[in-house]
């Protein structure tokens, strides 16, 4: 997609070198927006392969209100493993090799990388096979799904923001309050990772549903391709439920950054030419957005260039 390649190019040419929480370092810009017309095809990278089924299982995980990686691992989705693993290796229950700064060390030290990968595999197996262990160490805190579906009130009750949003679109589509927030300051200290994509708003006009996301922190090379596809999919799912066509997905970013150890991968991607966008295919079976399963969602005509590997910064 040209919009995304333009973002990469803009940050490479105009970004500022900054330090960051992970110690990796970034090239960063503040305040950037992309717009995608969802009528023109499903917005997923074609200049590198994005594993769409991982996008789907993560979004369904959010929609279920789940915050434990066990569901993800049961669907062969490893994108949240590092944050749960980090919590485990910092606990008194962990008795293995020292895992301090495991992400950076695995990138720089091949011998340590083998040790880290072995420990990670043991951790994943225990999460899947041991429910008690998963309950304790698979939890990521009150992240996205919890805030979307069970926002805690001061009276001890909960708010299902997503269900309320869908009902409001049906009954009051002109409302300017069609908003869901994942940013709950009270819960931030207990989250494995505070929400990067922190707030989204819907807008209805001319029989079409559009979505705007505000993302406080945008990992351009690894995270943003997932975020675009995820919120485009969410827009399609909600539009289907409320009987509207899809309009635009507008992606507004705060700190949009390229990690310093992703620069060569970015340059490789910029050398590629975008292909035609695929079409989203949804099963007619699910009654509501909350009834979808991974097998109900697919892409038709997705023929991307090969994937480009890059390390994740934790």
UniProtKB/Swiss-Prot annotation:
Primary location: cytoplasm
Record: residues binding (6R)-5,10-methylene-5,6,7,8-tetrahydrofolate: 219, 313
Q: In which pathway does it act?
A: Pyrimidine metabolism; dTTP biosynthesis
> Does the UniProt entry include the keyword Aminoacyl-tRNA synthetase?
no
Q: Where in the cell is it found?
A: Cytoplasm
Question: One of this protein's GO BP terms?
Answer: dTMP biosynthetic process
| Tagged with keyword Methyltransferase | yes
Q: Give the catalytic activity.
A: dUMP + (6R)-5,10-methylene-5,6,7,8-tetrahydrofolate = 7,8-dihydrofolate + dTMP
In the Enzyme Commission scheme, what number(s) does this protein have?
2.1.1.45
Q: Name one Pfam family in it.
A: Thymidylat_synt
Which residues are dUMP-binding? 21, 176-177, 216-219, 227, 257-259
Instruction: Cite the GO molecular-function annotations of the record.
Output: thymidylate synthase activity
Task: Give the disulfide map.
Answer: none
Which family does the entry's similarity section mention?
Belongs to the thymidylate synthase family. Bacterial-type ThyA subfamily.
Assembly and partners?
Answer: Homodimer.
Q: Which PANTHER family match?
A: THYMIDYLATE SYNTHASE, THYMIDYLATE SYNTHASE 1
**Which NCBIfam families does the record cross-reference, listed alphabetically?**
PRK01827.1-2, thym_sym
Entry function: Catalyzes the reductive methylation of 2'-deoxyuridine-5'-monophosphate (dUMP) to 2'-deoxythymidine-5'-monophosphate (dTMP) while utilizing 5,10-methylenetetrahydrofolate (mTHF) as the methyl donor and reductant in the reaction, yielding dihydrofolate (DHF) as a by-product. This enzymatic reaction provides an intracellular de novo source of dTMP, an essential precursor for DNA biosynthesis.
The protein, known as? Thymidylate synthase
Originating organism = Listeria monocytogenes serovar 1/2a (strain ATCC BAA-679 / EGD-e)
* Gene, per the UniProt record: thyA
